[in-house]
């Protein structure tokens, strides 16, 4: 990759690499090379979770564990990381195989999110935990300002579970109905079975998790909880 292009990306990120190979590795999807970024992604995921958890602990001293867990989940989830990647115009720097390029992989949420995690790991390996912490907190500065500790709403699955438990009902059972599309661009249909309801509640989403959340939301509406 052109050194001028790499210099521009490093400016967006806010960090200049000593070993630029680490950054190139972080940008390489498995479709492009056997030397891909998945191991870096694994490491970066853990580093990000730790740093965000630490920041929440210090920013919100009166918040309980459940509240901090929900806020962390919001801050480290795929669409948040993809938003950060978009702010860096990261898609145009990714190294993708021809198939992924043709299918629009450079703008796919999961690929962008994974690349951000890989970049986090590459910064850590190129420097130290204190440097990568400073960089991450810089990326998240405005997001922390917008976080409302009293307004962090639980996700639909959690709300449904808590409602059913409060009524002493059995927990919902989620099962996969159908999966449409190619492996890199699938749509999931999930069925949610709740004791006392004759019909199955249906959820649809771009991942199993999202489809389950959609099914749980529909269940809450059907139960007239929301």
Swiss-Prot record:
PROSITE patterns noted in UniProt: DS_RBD (PS50137), RNASE_3_1 (PS00517), RNASE_3_2 (PS50142)
Subunit structure: Homodimer.
Keyword set, alphabetical order: Cytoplasm, Endonuclease, Hydrolase, Magnesium, Metal-binding, mRNA processing, Nuclease, RNA-binding, rRNA processing, rRNA-binding, tRNA processing
InterPro entries, per the entry: dsRBD_dom, RNase_III, RNase_III_dom, RNase_III_sf
Lineage start: Bacteria, Pseudomonadati, Pseudomonadota, Gammaproteobacteria, Enterobacterales
Protein name according to UniProt: Ribonuclease 3
PANTHER family, per the entry: RIBONUCLEASE 3, RIBONUCLEASE III
Subcellular location: Cytoplasm
NCBIfam families noted in UniProt: RNaseIII
GO terms classed as biological process: mRNA processing; regulation of gene expression; rRNA processing; tRNA processing
GO MF, any single term: ribonuclease III activity
Residues in RNase III domain copies: 6-128
GO cellular component, one term: cytoplasm
Cofactor(s) it depends on: Mg(2+)
């Amino acid at each position: 990759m052109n050194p001028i292009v790499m210099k521009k990306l490093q400016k967006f990120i806010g960090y200049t690499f000593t070993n630029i190979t680490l950054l190139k590795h972080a940008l390489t999807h498995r479709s492009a090379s056997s030397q891909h970024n998945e191991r870096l992604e694994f490491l970066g995921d853990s580093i990000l979770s730790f740093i965000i958890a630490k920041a929440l602990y210090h920013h919100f001293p009166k918040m309980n564990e459940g509240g901090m867990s929900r806020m962390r989940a919001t801050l480290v989830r795929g669409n948040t990381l993809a938003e950060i990647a978009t702010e860096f115009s990261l898609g145009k720097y990714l190294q993708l195989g021809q198939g992924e390029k043709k299918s629009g992989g450079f703008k796919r949420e999961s690929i962008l999110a994974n690349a951000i995690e890989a970049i986090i790991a590459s910064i850590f390996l190129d420097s130290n935990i204190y440097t990568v912490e400073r960089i991450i907190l810089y990326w998240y500065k405005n997001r922390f300002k917008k976080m409302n500790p009293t307004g962090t709403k639980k996700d639909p699955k959690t709300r449904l579970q808590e409602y059913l438990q409060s009524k002493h009902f059995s927990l919902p059972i989620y099962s996969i109905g159908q999966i449409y599309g190619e492996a890199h661009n699938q749509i999931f249909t999930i069925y949610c079975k709740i004791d006392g309801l004759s019909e199955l509640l249906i959820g649809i989403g771009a991942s199993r998790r999202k489809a389950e959340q959609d099914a749980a939301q529909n269940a809450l509406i059907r139960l007239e909880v929301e």
